[in-house]
Amino acid sequence: VKYTLEDPDEKYSEELALLSKLSIDGVITTNWDDFCERQFPKFNRYVGQKELLFSKSIVNIGEIYKIHGCMREPESLVLTHEDYTDFNKRNAYLAAKLITIFIEHPIVFIGYSMNDNNIKSILTSIVQCLDQDKIGLLQNNLFFVEWNRDTNAEMEVERFDMLMSE
């Protein structure tokens, strides 16, 4: 198993340098690779829900949450249908932790859309715990950056509605 991505293409070096300098509280990723650890080497890394349960951190700043596992720990990977089913059944603490993070901090989803099943599942778990007025607060903290194949496309900002259903 290869534990790291190949060195990024030189044409992205400026963007990667800027990314490393961002003043962010943390990273939540479903990726298994070590890109985030290399970009933010001083951040504490938590792999899956088990590490979160026993972490001593109460700060929630400077942390990387690898919610679908890490290549350095193959047993932690969420990759099969059975893994995802198990993940969804057992993610109560993770959902609670994410609720806190999502409400208290702006969240930028890079490379995901509201149509991504993983994002839908996480947001559904969170929304089910909130009153309608709190859902509005949550909405204001979520930003999605998506890649558009059309190189001539203009930048768009869209609002996504999250509704609570009984």
Predicted regions and their residues:
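Generic structural hydrophobic/aromatic packing signal, biased to beta-strands
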Residues: 1, 64-67, 79, 142-145
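Active-site periphery "cap/insert" segments of enzyme catalytic domains
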Residues: 1-56, 72, 78, 86
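Short, well-ordered alpha-helical scaffold segments within catalytic/effector domains
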Residues: 9-17, 91-95, 120
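SIR2/sirtuin-family catalytic core signature
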Residues: 22, 42-45, 52-61, 72-74, ...
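A structural signal for short, well-ordered beta-strand segments and their strand-loop junctions
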Residues: 27-30, 66, 109, 144
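Active-site metal-binding loops of divalent metal-dependent hydrolases
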Residues: 32, 69, 112
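Glycine-rich phosphate- or other oxyanion-binding loops that anchor nucleotides, phosphorylated ligands
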Residues: 64-66, 73-90, 94
